């Protein structure tokens, strides 16, 4: 019986790559497809970028020097709306 060709779409992270040796024996070794590695890498970077944006936002918010309550509320709401829009775009 012929083996199906392994692709990231037919196999999960428990991907098995079957190779033929010179003497005709088959060996199986677990392997992560490159596409899954790349996706994990991208997700890690995106979460770091999002976290960095939040930290910068709160540092700016904390650095305001004795603003009035009204101006503080307006400024925070503007920043929050801008931040939320960027999250939707990305």
Swiss-Prot record:
Residues 1-27 have a biased composition (Polar residues). The record marks 66 as: High pathogenicity. Residues 1-34 are annotated as: Disordered. The keyword Ribosomal protein does not apply. Keywords: Apoptosis, Host cytoplasm, Host membrane, Host mitochondrion, Host mitochondrion inner membrane, Host nucleus, Host-virus interaction, Inhibition of host innate immune response by virus, Inhibition of host MAVS by virus, Inhibition of host RLR pathway by virus, Membrane, Modulation of host cell apoptosis by virus, Viral immunoevasion. The keyword Membrane applies. One of its GO terms (biological process) is symbiont-mediated suppression of host cytoplasmic pattern recognition receptor signaling pathway via inhibition of MAVS activity. Residues 65-87 are annotated as: Mitochondrial targeting sequence. One of its GO terms (cellular component) is membrane. Transmembrane segments: none annotated. Is not encoded in all strains, and seems to be dispensable for replication. Oligomer. Interacts with human SLC25A6/ANT3 and VDAC1. Interacts with host MAVS. Belongs to the influenza viruses PB1-F2 family. This is Protein PB1-F2. It comes from Influenza A virus (strain A/Chicken/Hong Kong/715.5/2001 H5N1 genotype E).
């Amino acid at each position: 019986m012929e083996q199906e060709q392994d692709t990231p779409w037919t196999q999960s992270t428990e991907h098995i790559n079957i190779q033929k040796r010179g003497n005709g024996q088959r060996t199986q070794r677990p392997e992560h497809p490159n596409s899954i590695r790349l996706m994990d890498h991208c997700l890690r970077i995106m979460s770091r970028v999002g976290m960095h944006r939040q930290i910068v936002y709160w540092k700016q918010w904390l650095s305001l020097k004795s603003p009035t309550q009204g101006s503080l509320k307006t400024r925070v709401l503007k920043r929050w709306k801008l931040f939320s829009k960027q999250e939707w775009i990305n």
